[in-house]
């Protein structure tokens, strides 16, 4: 099905472009969301008549998103989850969790605006991309830890998945004195 885009949509095109998309994508997403019109003569004329108004609305939404992006850019958010000794989470942190944490901090964000290829399953600092508008993206830091104290240590650059961090001991190779010589082992046998 051919549609006329009413706003910029990533991987499809700019506002006003006529693109061919799968019927289901058009019927179930683009048309109900008001992001596109069917590409016929009547809708082409309607779009051209409203083009200036649509561009003004798009610019306004972009400016609002840019204002939020300026506040959000470089922010760090702490997520406390239970995890094993090696840093593997018991569960995962998904786009929904990240959106809830950012929203709790006073920003308006939906989970589909958080771009995450796969759920986060380890503690540590993770950079996450947030798309506030098709033309405005921002990166935030998500600090996943077992406690707020651990999150503070991670923020300072400490690796909490090492033996030293887990058990509070320094990693040292065992000296030769600890091992018995093979000759002594044979004498005792």
Curated annotation (Swiss-Prot):
Signal peptide: none annotated. GO terms for cellular component: ribonucleoprotein complex; ribosome. It comes from the Bacteria. Gene3D superfamilies: Ribosomal protein L9, C-terminal domain, Ribosomal protein L9, N-terminal domain. InterPro entries: Ribosomal_bL9, Ribosomal_bL9/RNase_H1_N, Ribosomal_bL9_bac/chp, Ribosomal_bL9_C, Ribosomal_bL9_C_sf, Ribosomal_bL9_N, Ribosomal_bL9_N_sf. Pfam families: Ribosomal_L9_C, Ribosomal_L9_N. Keywords: Ribonucleoprotein, Ribosomal protein, RNA-binding, rRNA-binding. GO terms for biological process: translation. GO terms for molecular function: rRNA binding; structural constituent of ribosome. The keyword Ribonucleoprotein applies. Belongs to the bacterial ribosomal protein bL9 family. Binds to the 23S rRNA. NCBIfam families: L9. This is Large ribosomal subunit protein bL9. It comes from Brucella canis (strain ATCC 23365 / NCTC 10854 / RM-666).
